[in-house]
């Protein structure tokens, strides 16, 4: 269910980010002297914050449902561990949304950006399943594609192989920040139609 939650967040992010650019209402803000980079970062931070909070609520709802169904009351340390894992998964979600926001700046088409991101996620899962038994023999571009794909993280996380993927979290975090910075630079140079 997590991959489909990303798709919902992806659609939300692309629609919210490109709405003002498509309708032309952003020209008013720029005409009043607001810098394009300020508008870009405000929208991006809003999208990322709402997505992270929504994801944590989503996980908490499933956690409560599971407690009610099973009757098991977790200890405080177990609940804290779950929150930590949910936050770690949230970091990967934010990196994925950073990709979609960056593509929105470059392409400015909701359908194309959503299509590219969906293909990226689901092809990442397919390629990883084809290569997982022999990842050492895979070419460097394929390794970069697989390790940089959010499905690699979540497929390992869901199969309880968490020790090898924790080291990838800084990559997702720094990659997301880098994409947001590059997107801000691209937005400052882009002409608003």
Predicted segments, located by residue:
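Transmembrane helix boundary and interhelical loop/hinge segments in multi-pass membrane proteins
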Residues: 13-32, 36, 44
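Secretory targeting signals
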Residues: 1-16, 40-108, 125-126, 133, ...
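Terminal transmembrane helical anchor/hairpin motif
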Residues: 73, 114-189, 193
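Active-site-flanking alpha-helical
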Residues: 26, 40, 116
């Amino acid at each position: 269910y997590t991959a489909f939650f990303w798709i919902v967040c992806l659609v939300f992010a692309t629609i919210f980010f490109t709405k003002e650019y498509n309708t032309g209402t952003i020209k008013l803000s720029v005409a009043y002297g607001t810098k394009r980079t300020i508008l870009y970062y405000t929208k991006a931070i809003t999208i990322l914050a709402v997505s992270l909070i929504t994801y944590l609520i989503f996980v908490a709802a499933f956690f409560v449902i599971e407690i009610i169904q099973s009757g098991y009351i977790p200890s405080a340390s177990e609940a804290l561990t779950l929150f930590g894992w949910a936050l770690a998964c949230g970091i990967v979600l934010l990196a994925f949304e950073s990709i979609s926001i960056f593509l929105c700046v470059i392409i400015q088409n909701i359908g194309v950006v959503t299509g590219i991101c969906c293909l990226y996620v689901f092809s990442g899962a397919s390629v990883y399943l084809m290569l997982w038994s022999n990842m050492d023999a895979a070419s460097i571009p394929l390794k970069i594609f697989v390790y940089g794909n959010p499905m690699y993280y979540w497929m390992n996380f869901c199969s309880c192989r968490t020790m090898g993927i924790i080291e990838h979290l800084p990559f997702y975090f720094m990659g997301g920040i880098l994409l947001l910075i590059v997107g801000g630079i691209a937005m400052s140079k882009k002409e608003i139609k």
